Amino acid sequence: MSAEPAPHRARAQLEALTAAVADGTAGRGFSALRSAPVPTDPRAAAVLILFGILDGVPSGHAADDVSRDLDVLLLARATTLRSHPGQVAFPGGRLDEGEEPIAAALREAEEETGLDPAGVDVLGTLETLPLAFSQHLVTPVLGWWQHPSPVRVVDEAESAAVFRAPVADLLDPANRGVTVVRRDGQEWRGPAFHVPHATGIHLVWGFTAVVLDGLFDRLGWTEPWDRARELPLTVEPRPTR
């Protein structure tokens, strides 16, 4: 039996990916988002994809390429929000005037989860991605939680939960599937994840799931999973205006 990968191996892989994106050798990722229509009057936004060493119970799934105690920071948006209500997301939001994506991602993460940005090592950014549903162009910022700090729901009007999800749980084929959105005679299928948590099972779908799915593929972490398995939506999407 092979030894479990060391958790800090993931940091080296993430650093290699951001370096390849920066010098143009990473290839084109996130095809599902790149094929989507670009917003006509987009607003700039950034999200923080923050990996670290789990502070809770390690995953029960023995993933091939990541350790059981590697995690990623996620939050569940409040169900009362007008945009993406109830969805699991990365911390993040719109850029203020004159603000850069890295600064915005760290600021929003602090405002939404209470984390201390001083404990985050920013590894770099990925390609800016269109989010046509809410008219945004989003820059993912990859980070490593070198010195973790407590996180919590800071504003209940914005978030319902803040949690650190074991990456091995996300990679577990038993927790993977697709969601299907049907509207106006059209159908959109996308990757989805079930994330076990103390408060129940969270469904990760939409933009966040597409980014995680594409990121795992690019890092070589993905395990074979059933792409025909449908996971029912717990919160139906509604159009923004």
Task: Indicate residue ranges for each PLM-predicted region.
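N-terminal leader/linker segments that precede catalytic domains of diphosphate-processing enzymes
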Residues: 1-90, 94-111, 115-142, 146-149, ...
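NUDIX/MutT-family hydrolases
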Residues: 154-191, 198
